[in-house]
Amino acid sequence: MTDLTTSAIERVLRNNYLGHLAYLWQGKPHVIPITYYFDPADNTIISYTSEGHKIDAMRKNNSVTVQVEEIQSMFNWESAMVHGTFEELEGDIAKQKLHSFIEGVKSIIRRKERREVEFINEFSSKLYSRGIPIVYQVKILEIAGKRRET
């Protein structure tokens, strides 16, 4: 295994929209899949959720990790890890960031998967049945990455 350069880590983050979010809840680490968008201009990860233990946990302890991988095979993969702080967004900035999230993910899908998507539910499983979506970002403090190639 070798370390990824900063530009390679950013490429992994830019070229994907599915990752894993790690946070602490009641003293235990939790890791869940998320749909995200990497905003290189703000150096943030943008996502959204609904009320529940994940958002409660991040409100209490804003230290989180996001992990993203590109796996070709067991012997050929890249993994990027982001350590940062959770920040809940509100009002116009939340609307702006959610728009960036939607358009950014749609662009990645068009480029990588060569298909058109029109609605958020085509690429994100979060339902609005539990109220208004909570838009958040992870301010990136530290990044790391690994690669394995044979």
Can you name each region flagged by the protein language model?
Residues 41-43, 62, 141:
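Beta-strand-connecting loop/turn residues
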Residues 6, 51-52:
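Structural motif corresponding to alpha-helix initiation and N-cap regions
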Residues 1-20:
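Short, basic/aromatic recognition patches
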Residues 25, 68-70, 139-142:
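Short, structured patches in soluble enzyme cores that scaffold and shape functional sites
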Residues 54-89:
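Helix-adjacent hinge/juxtasegments
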Residues 78-150:
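Charged, gly/pro-rich active-site loop segments
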Residues 16-50, 66-67:
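Short beta-strand segments
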